[in-house]
Amino acid sequence: MKHLLLVVMGLLYTATAFPFGVYIFADMEGCTGVTNSEQISGGFGAARMEEDINACVAACFEAGATRVVVRDGHSSGRNVNPAHIDPRAELIQGQTPGVRYQHLDGCEAIILLGYHAMSLTPNAILAHSYSSRNTQAMYINGREVGEIGIDALIATEHGVPVVLVIGADDACREAEDWIPGVVTCQTKKSITTQSGKCLSAKRSHARIARKTKEAVAKRHSIPMIQPVYPSTLRTELVPKGSVRVVFPEYVRDPNPRIREKTGNNVEALLIGKPRK
């Protein structure tokens, strides 16, 4: 009995002596049950986003985190109702110009929740790269990239690894391709750009919780992907609103407008001046 008490006290000491935070960057398209454009423009998608966030937040704390920051990262950044989010979490809403991961200090792991595949991925649910209105494709040093790859590179620039990516099957494959060793959590399987086969909410949230705990436990062993500098970010732009979808796939415009930026900071190439 005395030995057991000492073990428990030791575990409690370890949890409190080495506090750490987890940063959850939440998008909507990859969340549980979201399969089409109509669902992300109203309350349905926001409610599903809240539920996935809460499953992830609770698991972070159960895994030993002493702080969890949630960034509402879909569109305007004003999607979830703060009253519906686990009160233990810190919630960031609204636009944060020039900074992808606001208030990352003290966090040892980043989770990309509700993410989707890059634009032009065949038959991938709601696939796009930052803008579904006018961005046809993006490349970093010649390699086609989406939000998962770029956000992982920016995370490296801040010294924090992406440990978990949560989304549809194609987003999970993309994450594994970009971040060797990353934990992935599949919430659904894409059928077309506007349809998918989903897990029940109960099963999906249980999977999110299990995968979150696994990823947080592995946070020191998942390597950060290393940017190659100078980096060139190439973006293929088409007229606003003309990213074409011929059901069930996206169709590439053969004559896009090209924008290129080169520099030694991926975050600055994407959104402007990086955090000092």
Put a short name on every predicted segment.
Residues 17-19:
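Boundary at the C-terminal end of the N-terminal hydrophobic targeting segment
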Residues 204-276:
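C-terminal accessory domains and tails appended to enzymatic cores
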Residues 40-56:
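Short catalytic helix/loop segments, enriched in acidic residues and glycine
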Residues 132-158, 167:
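Active-site glycine-rich loop that binds ribose-phosphate moieties when present
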Residues 86-103:
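A glycine-rich helix N-cap at a beta->alpha junction
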Residues 12-15:
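N-terminal signal peptide c-region/cleavage motif recognized by signal peptidases
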Residues 154-162, 166-211:
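Active-site rim beta-loop-alpha module in soluble metabolic enzymes
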Residues 1-4:
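Positively charged n-region of N-terminal signal peptides that target proteins for export
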